[in-house]
Regions:
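Helix-centric, low-specificity signal for extended rod-like, repetitive segments
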Residues: 91, 159-162
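Outer-membrane beta-barrel signature, preferentially recognizing the C-terminal barrel domain
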Residues: 123-153, 159, 166-225, 235-245
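Extracellular/periplasmic, surface-exposed regions of secreted and cell-surface proteins
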Residues: 229-231
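Face-selective signature of the C-terminal outer-membrane beta-barrel domain
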Residues: 1-147, 151-153, 210, 217-220
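Residues in flexible loops and secondary-structure boundaries
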Residues: 16, 62, 94, 106, ...
């Protein structure tokens, strides 16, 4: 993806790039994925599935502005799923999966911002804090998910489903290493390299009634996150000249 706009800057002393001076942003994201699944049927009542998948991403950037850092990200996961169906009335399934992930984020220094802040009289500590659009991060993750479900169909008129599970999400590059103004929201966003995977629990149930062409369904859903990743305002002003303040 590329975004082109006539060169502009918040610093009068920043020269336009010699090559492609009007290329504001460019992202070259390459994704490679692979997966393998094997199904085993133990009997007429039991079915098992073993699976593996992996993915590698490489993001390269260019342009005179900055939005996302360069990074490479690799994930791999192994899963096992079992289904037990003794008859046409009852079906029980359960599965577990473990994932491992690694992300390496490249640092990005804004030398023109550093020069601007020095000219404005900010001390070395403040300059060092603000001049990095992204920090170097090397992070390993490991987490698991599981699910357990039941389907009960006592008759053609009634069906009951119940599911419970645990899920997770690995933090993205911006959540780990961002340090600058997000122009879509006009706020200074700062990542946290100590973040762990986001974890959540889900439970849902449903009851479906069919009677003489009438169908009635009730399906409550509950979700709870034990390590939810969210924006936490600090109440502090950003010193960046393009912070929209």
């Amino acid at each position: 993806r590329e975004e082109w706009s006539a060169f502009h800057t918040h610093y009068g002393f920043q020269p336009a790039p010699e090559k492609d001076p009007d290329k504001e942003l460019a992202f070259d994201l390459n994704t490679y994925s692979a997966s393998v699944k094997a199904r085993f049927i133990g009997s007429s009542s039991w079915e098992h599935t073993l699976g593996w998948d992996g993915q590698h991403q490489q993001n390269d950037i260019s342009g005179y502005s900055f939005l996302l850092p360069e990074y490479h990200r690799s994930t791999t996961g192994l899963l096992w799923l079992t289904t037990y169906k003794p008859n046409n009335i009852l079906s029980v399934s359960g599965g577990v999966r473990y994932d491992y992930g690694y992300i390496g984020i490249s640092p990005h220094e804004d030398v023109y911002l550093a020069d601007y802040l020095r000219r404005q009289g900010y001390d070395d500590e403040q300059v060092e804090s603000y001049k990095w659009n992204s920090h170097a991060v090397r992070k390993h993750f490991g987490d698991y998910s599981f699910s357990l479900g039941l389907v009960w169909t006592p008759s053609v008129q009634h069906m009951v489903k119940v599911n419970i599970g645990r899920s997770f999400r690995l933090p993205g590059a911006n959540e780990l290493a961002a340090n600058g103004v997000h122009h879509g929201t006009f706020r200074h966003e700062q990542g946290d390299a100590s973040l762990k995977s986001e974890q959540g629990w889900q439970m849902d149930a449903s009851y479906n009634l069919r009677y003489h062409g009438l169908s009635v369904s009730v399906s409550p859903f509950v979700s709870w996150f034990s390590n939810y990743i969210f924006l936490r305002p600090t109440g502090e002003w950003s010193v960046l000249p393009h912070a929209g303040q």
